Amino acid sequence: NNMYLIDYHIHSNNSFDSKETVLSVCKAAIEKGIKEICFTEHFSVKEGIKSYGFLNLKKYSDEIKECREIFKDKLTIRAGIEICEPHENEEELRLILENIPFDFILGSVHNFDYNIGLAAYMSTHSKKESYSRYFEEVNKVCTSPYIDVVAHLDLMKRYAFNTHGNYDFNDYKEKIEEVLKNIIKSGKGIEVNTSTLRGMVNETMPSNDILKMYYDLGGEIITVGSDAHKVEDVGADIKESIEVLKNIGFKNIYKFKNRQAIPVEI
């Protein structure tokens, strides 16, 4: 079994919510038989949210360079970021990003109306309002020129699970279809995020229903990521998720270099 295992959603202590070093993540990846990883550190130009001003680009790029030297034959290391609500500050992002050679950029929705967190929003809104609003926002993210892939497309369920429960795919089918069509039309992709397999939700983000719909609509670009914030989660459920994609009909997953999508046969 020589599957080329890739983990394209990982956080180190270059993100506000992880304590792991780039070095320890790389070691863990090699131990687990992962061949290529991409760090996707939280990044935001929005004041008032936790990731604002946290990423030190000099530290980050120095650590990536150092680890590329150390592990050059054993592991391919890519440098990326995960941008919160990239549709809200396009001009600022443009000025920063046109000078930084990232390999890969994820776009995600963690807040509404600039800085209202998903959980906070949900505490004062119904299940239907919360999920509808979430998919509306994701629909705005997917056309941003500053992202390559939309992260955890149905993330809302992670926050909603305890209080509102998971959503029924059929209730949001039209909206999700619109989102996926926009992603495809704008040349972007989606990811399979395995982090919710490690919690109570017990399915990937997005669900298999969304993955199938993406395939049926002609979607091709898809990455797989653990969303690890701890070394023990690096590479978690990647192999299984690739099998799921294969069974749906996907022929490739994707890796990135200099923000160009590169297919990897599965």
Where are these regions (language model features)?
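Charged catalytic cores and adjacent phosphate/nucleic-acid-binding surfaces used
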Residues: N1-S12, V22, T163-I266
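An N-terminally biased module of ancient metal coordination in phosphate/nucleic-acid-related enzymes
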Residues: N2-H87, I96-N99, Y159, H164-N170, ...
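Structural preference for beta-strand elements that scaffold enzyme active sites
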Residues: Y4-D7, E36-C38, T76-G80, D103-L106, ...
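Alpha-helical scaffolding within the catalytic cores
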Residues: V25, E91-L93, S207-N208
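Conserved residues at the C-terminal ends of beta-strands
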Residues: T40, S108, L153, N193, ...
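Flexible, active-site-proximal loop/turn residues at the rims of small-molecule/cofactor binding pockets
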Residues: F43, N111, M156, T196, ...
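Extended substrate/RNA-proximal surfaces in nucleic-acid metabolism proteins
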Residues: S51-K185
